[in-house]
Amino acid sequence: MAPLLSQTLIHTGRFLLRRFLEPPPAVISAVAASRVCFHRYYSSKSLSLVSPLGLHCSSLFSPPALCNSAFSSSATSTTIEVQSTEHEVVIALGSNIGNRMNNFREALRLMKRGGICVTRHSCLYETAPVHVTDQPRFLNAAVRGVTKLGPHELLSVLKTIERDMGRKDGIRYGPRPLDLDILFYGKMRISSDKLIIPHERLWERSFVLAPLVDLLGSAVDNDTVAHWHSLAIHPGGIFQAWERLGGESLIGQDGIQRVLPIGDKLWDFSNKTHVMGILNLTPDSFSDGGKFQSIDSAVSRVRSMISEGADIIDIGAQSTRPMASRISSQEELDRLLPVLEAVRGMPEMEEKLISVDTFNSEVASEAISNGADILNDVSAGTLDPNMHKVVAESGVPYMAMHMRGDPCTMQNKENLQYDDVCKDVASELYLRVRDAELSGIPAWRVMIDPGIGFSKSVDHNLDIIMDLPKIREEMAKRSIAVSHAPILVGPSRKRFLGDICGRPEATDRDAATVASVTAGILGGANIIRVHNVRHNADAAKVCDAMLRRRRSKG
């Protein structure tokens, strides 16, 4: 295997270095694109109203499933006067006392009950305290929503939620379980003793601007958002305000980190490539079917992958290879649960994560109840209408993958037609993620997978691996938050590699996998899903070292 790996890497090394290291890195600059779109928008004579889904409409998109709350009451029984017109609002969230993530979840629940329909979520940020520095780090985020509450009534509801969550009067800028601030309210500019909109310190706070930018798309999506840009203290709008503070260059520093909540911890997927080791419990998987069906063999395999550098173990009990037959929920659970329980109890799994690969909501629910940290859905919810609801209620992160059709139809001719595979995959996957968000899965809990080998030809797979930044850029046009989601690539041992290299046996494709994974990481992948953990973990370490070196040189 070593000579084969060396030969493959020598042949691919020159291309990869030329493609990824000589020019500046192919990293998304959504903010720069946003500024161009912003100026184009204002130079237009007619401002079209576009929904968060990018569809022209006469009013803001307001999904009934999320917006059925009684607008006549707040989080308590107090009667609130409402307006007849819905207004789009932006609300910032902060917390540094108690279980910060639970504080956010409860705040969102109370906001919905109080008459605020949340339609978009930012990414999640852990930030250093300012002004009063001798206190715990904050968790910060922001949401967009619509409400019929007037601005002062909205403020009253938010203050009630803060009190209900245990906030008391104390040191200004001091510790608090929950902080809710109105950043924008429709097209209004408000200045009163109790309320100033836009928020008076908005433009100087990176921990507010970072999540605010996430709520936008690099293409201005409606005239209310255009008005918010016009309120900025800089002519380039919100995006230029963010850039003037440092923009994306700030993220990852001690002062502000973009994180994803998994279990009781916050994970930063930007500081290293995370390796996901594959554990197939199926008799018919294309690469290692039937090898790990017993508990002992599965546990032994996990122990080996952990020792070789796996950060995540992805357990699947339903084959998703082309033409795979769908098994019953009970059969999938019978395969999965005993192994999941055994793996969860392994001492080696401390500080490691378990992902369960299923497109069945019943299996997903049981897996999460039995210790799964991540739900990995190859259909992004298209094969089970209950999946998004189950994941939303569970609180676990959701890996949404692009696929057309199902495993039996995904390689049909009609599912292989693309105008531009990266743009089309980004657009279709965004719509699935958007549906998940409107079902209650915040953007800060989403990871994305462009679906290498699923509804793709050889050339499609190569285009995706080489142009991951293009996928992020396309998503950023509609949601900068989604464009920041961790990206997984999973080319491991797949048929297109065999077609390229003349390797009909899946187990002979590990060297080709290393080459494709290397290209993916240098193109911006955060997670690699592989069979051979040892070789790919080494490749990831080398790629990470090259990327760190490049960043250090500016």
Swiss-Prot record:
Cofactor(s) demanded: Mg(2+)
InterPro entries: DHP_synth-like (IPR045031), DHP_synth_dom (IPR006390), Dihydropteroate_synth-like_sf (IPR011005), Hppk (IPR000550), Hppk_sf (IPR035907), Pterin-binding_dom (IPR000489)
UniProt: Mg(2+) binding residues: 280
Catalysis: reaction(s): 6-hydroxymethyl-7,8-dihydropterin + ATP = (7,8-dihydropterin-6-yl)methyl diphosphate + AMP + H(+); (7,8-dihydropterin-6-yl)methyl diphosphate + 4-aminobenzoate = 7,8-dihydropteroate + diphosphate
GO molecular function, one term: ATP binding
Regulation: induction: Not induced by salt stress.
A GO CC annotation given for this chain: plasma membrane
EC category name: transferase
Homology family: In the N-terminal section; belongs to the HPPK family.
Function: Catalyzes the first two consecutive steps of tetrahydrofolate biosynthesis.
Protein name: Folate synthesis bifunctional protein, mitochondrial
Protein's organism: Arabidopsis thaliana
